[in-house]
Every structure is written in structure tokens, then in C-alpha cells.
């Protein structure tokens, strides 16, 4: 979540200019080489010239640009009633099983702005004098201190990151999921990954402390006159922590911090990297998007431009090596310059190429950060979503990742995250236009802005195929844009479930890269119809048969897919046949399907849907599979293999050819 600033800064920007009331501790991301970013008002954060303006008051979308198409106002998701827990709901192909509300310690717990917990939350966010912020804005702002963020999974446990710490759930029975452990440890965003007995957590905000204690640091003085838009960084603190925390979770009810690796820009997100050739260590790619801290606080940190300091902390990621037998010895082992121009050696070798803005095309800006990196070790590649660019990395040597391709797009405002198709032949990038706080799915918001961009990948080169955006128009008070998702392991298809903040959850089929389609969804009405309150689905991931979503304001949602004309029960059952021991979405692992007949039935359904085989052959296949299931008669199955292989060589559809070959392989040697 971010574009040019952390969400904390975006929420508080208008309060700075209206009242000059909080410290620079919440200053954050920069998408330019400037060492200290300047707030950029968005439609939700109005210019200071509008005296008394409320930055949370929704604004209608500007006119749709010529030649662009917006979202569908006729969709049932566009007319849902508002509310925190009583909001209207709409769903297709998804059943909502339960919502586990946030634990009390991770909620404001009061609608009274003067409540001590509300005031403490504002202090954590760097507000020096809350009395100068209107009461309604105080509540909306304070909620950020307890925002849910990303998810990770291991065995029967789900790890839910939060700006205030981590919550661990027992999901051994998804219908009876329950909270096991709450660990208070502020610092935001709190993105998490897990490997064996280790839990990793990203910390970026300046309220993080080495010992995880929640008191933060005293807010600094208000910015001096003329510095409201570019306040100084917070005063150096020896106990401040910004980087990656490492916990030992051998005792799941009592995590112990065993290491804390400091970085110059903190860790907005991180990526767990497992080297198949190295059994003794794991690696962490750290994506820092926040301001560069002072060298007085962490030696060697510099936020200067490359021409002033070639050792600048900008224009790089950090790689942490974690010895599995001695995680307390974790340390940064390299800081790759992923954006370097190989011809000139210039660190700022990539730029956005220009993007869209309120007043038309904006000038290109240098890319100096990655927001998120997804590694796919099975193919030795990673896809980086890096502010102004999407990049492709060779990670065969995980300590020294090398950029091998890069793309940009004038329709993209901020390259946010990436996912590979299972065969590694496609990459889905997301654009977080509006930084996650903006309402960007309104009827007049173009469906190429704040969308997914699907690229084909061949010979280590990316080529654009199409866009996909949530098709349903959302309201002016609903923050909505493309966000985090994962593959759904339906064999024979490329399907991704994805979070869209208050746009809900959308399931996209991108098997045909040029024509992606929505096949399922779930959505709620706005939290507040009159105020843009940060909420909705941060992440939506498939894990061992269910969909889990971190709802920013409400808690943990659990879903299951249901059959429709777009997805059969056999396809859902085949996806459920895939079981994994752990899941960290940025560390993508190859999906392998068992040679079970339920998987064969899914392929048959797909071949019927695409009309790749005539009806009589579909009927023969189903009859043979049924006989094998009920009477263990395998002879008929094997007799069908030659004709399937022949059809695979004749069909013009690459997808159907792959399905036919996979089906033939199962029928030849089914696992009963």
C-alpha cells in the first residue's frame, strides 16, 4: 500500500497544512531521488488553500478522459448499503463463511475522539497536538494505527500482519477458526512471512522500537513556517527500529524476537527467498519505500541524489542473509542497484516514462524503489513492482539479483505487486493508483488506471497483453484499487483471487492473457457513505481449499468458492486437492496436481466448456472415470489415452492442448 507516501502520511497531509500539528515522524515514501518527499494533495486530501477542508470528505470523480471506459454502475455491487458490520453484501461464486473481528487490543474500541486509546493511536502516528484536528478526522486517522495488512500461512496457522503487531489464528477447521496469539509490536506495515520456526515482519514507520514496546517516541515540534510541505525527519533515536524483525515461533503462543535487522529506509514489504542450492540459509529481499533516516541514527544512511552521493540509500533494495541455525546473526549481505543503466553505470537508469495525473500526463520520474518483489525460484526469476516500472530479475544467485528486463506504462501510476502464472509464461502486475486511500473504481475512473496489467513472458522478455480492472463501479467514499492476490490452483486455467480494498474480492481468469474475465466476486457496501475511511480487503489468498482475506478495518474474512457456469464443482475440488505446508505469496512456489481422477474430471469439464471435444467423447470420458472411481476399472481409462494425445496435437488452442495432454497422463496412471 502506497504511492508516493505511506498511508499515514497521506491520511495526515491535510492536517499538516491546515493546522501544522504533527511531527515529521510520519514522512514517508519517495518516488523521486529527492531525499525528503513533499506531500502531494490527492482528490481526497485537498489543497491547503481550501480553508477548513476535510481530507476525508469524498469527491466525485472527474470526467472520464476521452477514449476511456469506466466501471459498470448497473452491477449489484454498486448499490450496497453502508456500515461497519451491517453493510450490504453481494457475491457471485463465493460464499462468505465467517468474519473474525479484530482482537480488542487491535481496535480503537471507542467512537469518542477523546478516548485515551484514540489519543494514544494519534500519538503513535506522530500527531503532536490532536486538539487542532477536527474530531471526526481524529477518529478516521487514528484507525490507521490498527490497520490489518498482509497474510502468511504455515500448517494450520494463519499469520495476520497489522500496523500494531501480528495476530496468529488456528485455521485447522476453517469454520471454527480462532485466535491463538496476539503480539503487540507497532511499526507498520507489519507485513509477514514465515519459514519453519521463523516469522519475519516488516517495519517502516518511525514509531517502531527495538523492543516492540508500544509507546513510540515523543512527537517532534510542529514544522516551522514554510516547511509544512517538507518537514525535517524525526530526531535520531537510538531505540528506534525500522527494518525486518525476526521471531522464533517454535512456541506459537509465545513468539520471541531473536533478531532485528535495521535498514536505511525501513521495510515497507519484504520477500522470503529460498535458494534450492542452499539448505542452511534463507534470504530476505527488503523493499524500502519510506524516507531515508539520518546517519546519526544508522551509520551509512544517505538520502542524497546519486550525483551528490554514490552511496545513497536510494535506488536499491537490501538483501538479508538469515542462517537457519543462528537467525540472531542475520545481516545485510548486499544492496543491489537494480535500476542501474548498464551502459553508463548511472544508478537512476529507469524512469516511469510519464504517467497520468489530474492535469494530464505527468513528467517521467526516476525509479528509486521497489514496492514489492515476487520470486519464483523454480524458474530462477523474480518480478519486481518498482514504483515507475515493472522489472524482471534473474535470481539464480539470490544475493546478487540481476535485472534482465523492464517495462513502463503511461496508464500506470505506481507499480505495486506482481504474480507469475504457474507455468511462468505470464506476469500480472498491479497499479496502486491513489496509494490505497483513494476512491479509484468510480464510474468515471478509467478501467486502465489502477488496474492489473497482464504481460506475456518469453525468452526473459515481457510483452504487454491486456488490462483487467474490477468491473463494478464503487462509491466516492470507498477506497478501491488493485491490490494483493494469489493464484487459485484450478488445473488447466490461470485464475487469481485478488483484493480491491473496499471494492471487495474479485476472481480473475487470465488463461487467455488478452481477454481476462471475472468469474467470481464478493463485496460489501462502504464503511461510511459520507467519509472516506480506510478499509476493505488488503489481501485475498487461496490456502488449502479456502480464501482468506485481511480486512483492514474489520478483521479476518474466510470464504469458499461455489460452482457457477464459470467454475464447476469438479474444478473447485481439483483445486482443493492441492495441499501445501506453508504459503508466502511473494515466494511463489510451483503448483503440482496429484494424478487423481477429480483432477481429470476438472479437465473434462474444461474441454466441454471450450468445445474442444464433441459431446459423445465427453460422455465416454465421464463414464470411464465414473467406472474407475466406483469399480476400479482402469482398462477403459487407458484405452482413451491415444485419442486424447492425438487430439492434443490437432487442436488450435494451446490451453486445450495442455489440458488434453494432462488428462491423458492422469488416465494412463491414475492415483486411486
Predicted segments with their positions:
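Bacterial N-terminal signal peptides that target proteins for export
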Residues: 2-13
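Bacterial N-terminal signal peptides
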Residues: 11-23
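Hydrophobic alpha-helical elements and their junctions with loops/disorder across both membrane
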Residues: 20-21, 425, 671
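Sec/Tat signal peptide C-region and signal peptidase I cleavage site
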Residues: 24-28
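Feature marking well-ordered beta-strand scaffolds used for ligand recognition
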Residues: 29-603
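Soluble extracellular-acting proteins and domains
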Residues: 571-672
Amino acid at each position: 500500500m502506497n504511492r508516493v507516501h505511506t498511508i499515514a502520511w497521506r491520511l495526515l497531509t491535510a492536517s499538516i497544512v491546515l493546522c501544522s500539528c504533527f511531527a515529521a515522524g510520519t514522512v514517508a515514501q519517495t518516488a523521486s531521488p529527492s531525499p525528503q518527499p513533499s506531500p502531494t494533495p490527492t482528490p481526497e486530501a485537498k489543497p491547503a488553500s481550501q480553508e477548513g477542508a476535510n481530507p476525508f470528505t469524498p469527491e466525485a470523480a472527474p470526467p472520464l478522459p476521452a477514449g476511456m471506459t469506466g466501471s459498470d454502475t448497473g452491477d449489484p455491487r454498486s448499490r450496497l448499503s453502508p456500515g461497519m458490520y451491517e453493510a450490504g453484501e453481494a457475491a457471485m461464486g463465493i460464499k462468505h463463511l465467517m468474519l473474525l473481528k479484530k482482537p480488542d487490543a487491535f481496535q480503537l474500541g471507542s467512537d469518542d475522539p477523546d478516548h485515551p486509546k484514540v489519543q494514544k493511536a494519534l500519538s503513535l502516528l506522530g500527531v503532536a497536538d490532536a486538539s487542532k484536528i477536527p474530531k471526526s478526522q481524529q477518529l478516521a486517522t487514528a484507525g490507521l494505527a490498527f490497520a490489518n495488512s498482509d497474510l502468511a500461512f504455515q500448517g494450520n496457522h494463519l499469520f495476520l500482519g497489522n500496523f500494531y503487531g501480528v495476530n496468529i489464528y488456528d485455521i485447522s477447521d476453517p469454520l471454527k477458526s480462532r485466535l491463538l496469539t496476539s503480539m503487540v509490536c507497532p511499526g507498520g506495515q507489519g507485513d509477514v512471512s514465515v519459514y519453519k520456526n521463523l516469522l519475519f515482519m516488516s517495519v517502516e514507520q518511525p514509531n517502531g522500537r527495538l523492543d516492540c514496546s508500544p509507546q513510540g517516541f515523543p512527537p517532534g515540534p510542529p514544522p516551522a513556517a514554510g516547511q509544512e510541505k517538507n518537514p525535517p525527519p524525526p530526531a535520531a533515536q537510538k531505540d528506534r527500529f525500522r527494518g525486518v524483525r525476526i521471531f522464533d515461533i517454535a512456541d506459537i503462543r509465545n513468539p520471541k524476537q531473536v533478531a532485528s535487522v535495521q535498514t536505511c529506509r525501513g521495510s515497507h514489504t519484504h520477500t522470503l527467498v529460498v535458494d534450492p542450492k542452499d539448505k542452511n540459509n534463507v534470504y530476505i529481499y527488503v523493499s524500502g519505500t519510506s524516507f531515508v533516516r539520518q546517519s546519526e541514527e544508522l551509520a551509512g544512511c544517505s538520502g542524497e541524489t546519486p550525483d551528490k552521493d554514490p552511496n545513497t540509500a536510494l535506488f536499491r533494495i537490501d538483501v538479508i542473509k538469515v542462517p537457519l541455525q543462528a537467525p540472531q546473526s542475520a545481516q545485510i549481505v548486499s544492496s543491489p542497484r537494480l535500476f542501474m543503466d548498464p551502459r553508463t553505470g548511472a544508478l537512476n537508469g529507469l524512469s516511469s516514462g510519464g504517467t497520468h495525473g489530474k492535469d494530464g500526463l505527468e513528467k517521467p520520474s526516476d525509479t528509486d524503489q521497489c514496492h514489492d518483489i515476487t520470486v519464483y525460484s523454480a524458474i530462477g526469476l523474480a518480478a519486481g513492482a518498482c514504483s515507475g516500472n515493472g522489472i524482471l530479475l534473474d535470481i539464480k544467485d539470490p544475493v546478487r539479483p540481476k535485472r534482465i528486463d523492464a517495462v513502463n506504462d503511461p496508464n500506470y501510476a505506481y507499480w505495486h505487486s506482481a504474480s507469475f502464472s504457474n507455468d511462468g509464461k505470464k506476469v500480472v502486475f498491479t497499479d496502486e493508483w491513489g496509494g490505497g486511500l483513494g476512491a479509484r473504481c468510480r464510474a468515471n475512473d478509467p478501467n486502465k488506471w489502477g488496474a492489473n496489467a497482464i504481460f506475456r513472458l518469453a525468452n526473459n522478455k515481457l510483452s504487454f497483453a491486456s488490462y483487467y480492472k474490477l468491473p463494478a463501479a464503487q462509491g466516492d467514499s470507498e477506497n478501491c484499487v488493485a491490490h494483493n492476490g494469489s493464484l487459485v490452483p484450478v488445473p488447466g486455467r490461470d485464475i487469481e483471487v485478488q483484493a480491491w480494498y473496499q471494492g471487495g474480492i474479485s476472481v480473475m481468469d487470465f488463461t487467455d492473457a488478452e481477454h481476462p474475465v471475472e468469474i467470481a466476486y464478493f463485496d460489501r457496501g462502504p464503511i461510511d457513505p459520507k467519509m472516506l475511511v480506510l478499509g476493505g480487503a488488503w489481501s485475498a489468498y487461496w490456502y488449502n481449499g479456502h480464501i482468506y482475506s485481511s480486512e483492514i478495518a474489520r478483521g479476518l474474512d474466510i470464504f469458499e468458492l461455489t460452482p457457477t457456469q464459470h467454475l464447476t464443482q469438479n474444478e473447485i475440488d481439483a483445486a482443493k486437492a492441492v495441499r501445501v505446508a506453508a504459503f508466502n505469496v511473494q515466494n511463489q512456489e510451483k503448483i503440482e496436481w496429484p494424478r487423481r481422477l477429480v483432477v481429470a474430471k476438472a479437465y473434462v469439464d474444461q474441454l466441454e466448456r471450450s468445445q474442444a471435444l464433441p459431446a459423445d467423447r465427453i460422455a465416454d470420458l465421464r463414464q470411464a472415470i465414473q467406472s474407475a472411481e466406483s469399480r476400479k476399472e482402469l482398462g477403459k481409462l487407458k484405452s482413451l489415452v491415444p485419442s486424447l494425445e492425438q487430439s492434443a496435437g490437432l487442436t488450435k488452442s494451446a490451453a486445450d492442448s495442455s489440458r488434453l495432454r494432462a488428462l491423458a497422463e492422469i488416465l494412463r496412471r491414475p492415483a486411486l
